Amino acid sequence: MNFHSLYDQGFARVAAVTLPVHPARPFENAREIIDTARELDARGVAVGVYPELCVSGYAIDDLLLQDVLLDTVEKALGSIVEASADLLPLLIVGAPLRKDNALCNCAVAIHRGRVLAIIPKSHLPNYREFYEKRYFVTMPPRACERIEVPWGGVEEFSGGPVWVPFGQVLLSADDVPGLTVGIEICEDMWVPVTPATELALAGATVLANLSASPITVGRGADRELMVRSVSARCSAAYIYTAAGIGESSTDLAWDGETMIYEAGERLAIGERFQEGAHITIADVDLERLRTERKRQNSFTDNAQRYFAGDERLSPQEVEITLDPPRTDLGLERAVNRFPFVPNDPTRLEQDCYEAYNIQVAGLVQRLRAIGNPKIVIGVSGGLDSTHALVVASRAMDLLGRPRTDILCYTLPGFATSERTKTNATLLCQYLGTSFQEIDIRPAATQMLADIGHPYGEGEATYDVTFENVQAGLRTDYLFRLANHLGGIVLGTGDLSELALGWCTYGVGDQMSHYAVNTGVPKTLMQHLIRWVVASKQFDDRVGEVLLSILHTEISPELVPAKPGEKMQSTQDKIGPYNLQDFTLYHVLRRGARPSKIAFLAEKAWSDASVGSWPVGFPEEDKVAYSLEEIVKWERLFLWRFFSQQFKRSALPNGPKVMAGGSLSPRGDWRMPSDVSGADWVAELDEAVKGLVD
């Protein structure tokens, strides 16, 4: 395996091509196709999709019925077949072809000097500007037969003319796992039950649409809606290309739109109304698509119901060997640094609005269901407890209850800083909650002495026991206060901490009566608090404190810092949340292999100047990570993720927030508490052998 090879990492490079059309000049069009095919080959493309009827031109009307044109189309196709002999890509081009005494609007699949299959258009539009039934016929639904193609290359064994499948087919690469291509043509995408749907249910992971599609105002957005929808519903990649410059403008105009979607996400879109040939390239994640279908068992159920055991309904399969380059070709797709945080400002604002209100709605329902008790919460002046408190405040407002029913406690320990304690105090004061400070140091010192810990005898020993005595006492106080005052303890820990087991089990911050933050990753938490400030959920005084908290080092504040040293840092211990949330998303939502996560992380994080950052992200925090750093922290993530499952197995109730998933043992993530992650670490180490120490 080559760690830096996109093909070895489960991707395939695909392209949508639009080119200058020469109406009724097949050899000129073939030349354009061959020229772009050579460029696709040079760029390591596995599948290249061209527009509908690109060999002849689409808008040539009754010339489509002229034998002179059709004879020339076949000869031009023969020249494309011949030129493809030494080229990598599977080429899918559009042409009018005779079948018996009829004419079909076809896609022709060509690879390495052979015609692999011919796919006729299933649905012919005959309304508004379209009159395709004047020229073409359709084939019986799902029918597939074999026809002789004299121009289709040479049969490998007989040396005679080629007989190829004619109808619905699946084109599968035997050396690129998961690359199975299904083809439909233009109008096929616009009908209620599309050929693409049938092809996806039969196993196609990559769907190609050869389109002509003249442009009118708004049609570009309509196309994109359809492509996105099909790719999302079918858990597939979708390659779309439309006819462009050169098509007849007698009554219509053409924009040459190209786009590539994957499972509802846009990977690439081409500029419209361009002169000359235009190639839109993206690397589709085949492993992601296969994993998504495995996870969504209803996809397989739907396929079984649709085909119902009748093999005659299934497309014919054609197998090819691509032999793609296993070298570093880069990666032709954007990889989000923060997969839980969208870069688009409008989408980020919407996500924050929904996340915040999901948390509030979950807490409101729980309070109503159990008789509207008071809320007991420990407020440290850190991100998580701060956000839990603002969620609780909003919940009380919706319930029509006074915020004084939120009983806030700050519980300073041996390393609590003046800044965090001040912020906690001011936040509670400005929100109008009940507030009390309980110094846990005397009780912690006594407990350490009682158990014979060196600190109890005056020795500066700051080990895990020293830390957990403080964490445990805080939780113990909160639960006893809840008992005493008729409340519930509101948990504050977040999704990232749960993944890493960065919490104290049982009598510690792992436990609460209800936990509002367990579905929120740390990297989103900061944006949520910014959104709370920007959207004026509370007054300006609260906003100022929230901004101060945002600029505070993330720390458990359990170990005192020596004079001149920096305070205890969570990220120094368990890794940057930037990287750990990246890994968490790809484990939880994508089911990706560790080596692939490292590959993607390097693409996302190796250069801070490349790619986009979420709106409002501080300039000073825009950092980069080397592959060595990425692998170091991913190893730690894997070790902690497996070894700390026992904490998640006893997770309190709390709402799922992110589509990226949750770690609730009753929901998205079910895993034994006593398994080892050694094989996952070994897979990572084997892949990066020789690249990092």
What are these regions (language model features)?
Residues M1-G378, R394-R403, F435:
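Enzyme catalytic cores with a strong preference for nitrogen-chemistry domains
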Residues N29, P177-L179, C234-A236, I245-S248, ...:
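ATP/NTP-dependent adenylation/nucleotidyl-transfer catalytic domains that generate, transfer
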